[in-house]
Structures are given as structure tokens and as C-alpha cells.
């Protein structure tokens, strides 16, 4: 169902996990369709996890879990997601970095909500990369939905078409729907990985992958094909700048100040 992270063929030693979860809709009583304020007494069933899918970056093997995988528990209570929440947490505990679309706002918080509900320990809090945040911060796509970005970039855009009936049929125990849900969940990983690989060279706040490597390495992708690319200057310092030949990041700089002590003494700055 899941396994330890790999070193991506020796290219990168950081364990980067891409993942996606699918959840059941809440079931509530309402007096109408629009502008409803749902009180706690109107809640029939809170949302719960249906499936999750994950893969290690640049590795072909995909891991997943779903409620029907645990037949005895599913037969006893088809809404009890403890086993699949635990299996996802176990996999994430092996990761240095996790990647998801809207992961910081939804997936990570939602997972912790279920962990505390079931009395399970917190995950080891790997660093996170949220491709939705990247899209909003660094680009101006007409839509920041994962599918729409994939279509715009022409990467992994052939996603299975679904509607709400798929979720409803899973909740109602339709096994064909469950198989379709797993396929849908797994297929989300394809555009997620391709988009992440395209975007990471544009990020200035990516977790520094250089700390996982020996010698010089790109902070965004861990690649070692760095070429000198001019200089980066601050008001008081000068640093070597590099371009990564693997991900295209051209904003890498060394940490050594190239200005000697005498030159720095002669520098003047504005008082305000």
C-alpha cells in the first residue's frame, strides 16, 4: 500500500511526496438551497476521507488507500476513516517535503483534524509546497484550478470527467463508483507532479534542497548543473549568481560576500 521514500535514482536525496485526498460531502438538513446557515443540530454526517493517493517525486509507483480496502471496518462503519488517515500519516512521516494543490489550506489541516479526532499522533510536520499558493504568488493564470493550469501548460490535462454523482455513489456504497474514485484520485497526481516540476524554478521560497546534497546544488530542485550567471548585489554586498540547468532557476546566489573588507569599509549608504 505504501513504502519508504526513494532517492529518485540518485538525482535527489530529499524525499518529496506528492499527494491528494478525496473527502465525502457533509450531509445536513436545510430549509432551502441558497444562503443557508447550517446549525450543529442540522448536521447529519460530518465529512470524512474517502481515498488518498500519493507518489514520490520522479518515481513511477503510486500508493493509495480507500475505505473499502479495509473490508471489516467498512462493513461495520462505512464512514470510519481512521485506518486510511493513519496510513497516509505513516507515509507522510517518511517525507522531507510534501506537495499538494491547496495543501496548506485544505489537505494538511483536514488531515490533522482527522488525526486528532481519532486520537492519532500528529505527523512529523514535513515542509510543504502548495502549488495553489505558487500559482497565486508568482503567476497570473486566468484560473488557478489544477485542471485549468494543466490545460494552459499542456501537461497532464486529460483528467477523468466527473460530477457530484461520483461522490454520492461512493457514500452510498457503489463499488463501481469507488473504483472510479480511486482512478480519479490517482490521476490528479499526474498534473500535480508536472506542474510542480514546471513551477519550482520560479519559486524564491522553495525549501532549500541544497541542504540534502553534498556540494553545490540548486535550492529549488537539487540539481548540480549550475553555471555562473552574473552577480547579485545588495547595498553592502556582492554575491555570485547562478543559473540552474535542470529547473531553470536563475536567481540562485552564493553565500560568500565577494567584496573584500577594505571595499566594504569604503561603501556609503543613505541615512534614511
Predicted regions span which residues?
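Metal-dependent phosphoesterase core characteristic of DEDDh/y 3'-5' exonuclease domains
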Residues: 2, 14-15, 47-60, 65, ...
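Short cysteine-rich clusters marking metal-coordination/redox-active sites
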Residues: 218-221, 244-247
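Short, non-ligating residues that shape and space the ligands of small metal-coordination modules
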Residues: 225-229, 253-254
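Short linker/helix segments within small regulatory modules
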Residues: 230-241
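Residues immediately within or flanking Cys/His clusters that coordinate Zn2+
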Residues: 213-218, 241
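Long, charged amphipathic helices and adjacent flexible linkers at domain junctions
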Residues: 209-210
